[in-house]
Amino acid sequence: MPQIREERIRAADGHEFAGHLVVPESGSGPGMIVVQEIFGLTDYIKGVCTRLSELGYVALAPALYSRIDPDVALDERQPDAMPLAFGMMQRLDVPQAVRDAAEALAHLRTLPEVRDGRAGIIGFCLGGGIAYFVAADSDPDVAVCYYGSAIPAELGRAGKVHCPVLFEFGDADEYISAEQREAVKQAFEGRPHTEFHVHSGANHAFDNHNASLFHHPEAAARAWEETSAFLSREFPV
């Protein structure tokens, strides 16, 4: 059975925040930061940590809304979840959240369960953009970005991304246009250790099984197969 515990992460400015940690049954492995959607540190995001642990990774999901409300985790299944989530996102200091995610990455590397201090990052929705920003501003060993709507406007940072990176998008995404997806693809075209996938019929947040408006089971399964293969090749256990 995987081991689950809460981690306490201290930022450079002294702010302390929680993280949900899942250690694989083997007891050790490379690390992966899991960055939340706009709904916060939800059961879905905790489930992603469990999925990564099943692949052999030590997964840590930091509570990046902690500077607003340390306990917030919205239920995507409730009708008021979307407006509440957009309200939280509008209050979020994104550059600070990127710094906090990088602090979580540094913290993860210090844990005894993380082999050789190796750690990467994966993010979904809001977290897809944050994962990209951390890849540009910090030093993860790998980055996986699911439908990060903030990425197209920040492609000037693409040259600062030096780790292997995987992008997953849906072609029916209401928040990321075909032109924006193509711009991301072009920014990374021809670079080694980079993958770009677009899933037919899939909306934003297609991986989230608790978000019935968006979930696309077939696309989610394909994307996770691609993610697993990418990590196995570029960031092996």
Predicted regions and their residues:
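N-terminal cap/leader regions of alpha/beta-hydrolase-fold enzymes
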Residues: M1-V237
